[in-house]
Amino acid sequence: MNVLAAILLASTSLHITVWPNGSDQTPKKTYTLTCTPVGGTLPFRAGACARLSRLKAPFAPTPKNVACTEIYGGPEEALVTGRFRGTLVRARFNRRDGCEIDRWNRVAFLFPAA
């Protein structure tokens, strides 16, 4: 693999939108995060990049046919778009059941406004 390909595969550049009261409500908060080099508007960027680097598939959806507890975690919603390790990402997060709360909690460090 050449150097350019390695850089593209390692690159992370994310746009994060958080709706503390649900996506149909205002206000919303927006942040950016880049990890190669570390930058953006997200607080604690270096720590966020380090935590992301340890996660296998932080933006994967809940698998189909999984039983989830019916626990409501709150109205918060978030959208993450951009590139993670060179792969395009478009992931929505909410706290409407146990599975979604678990997904949210894995990357909650990306959602400081919630």
Where do the language-model regions lie?
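N- and C-terminal low-complexity/disordered segments
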Residues: M1-A114
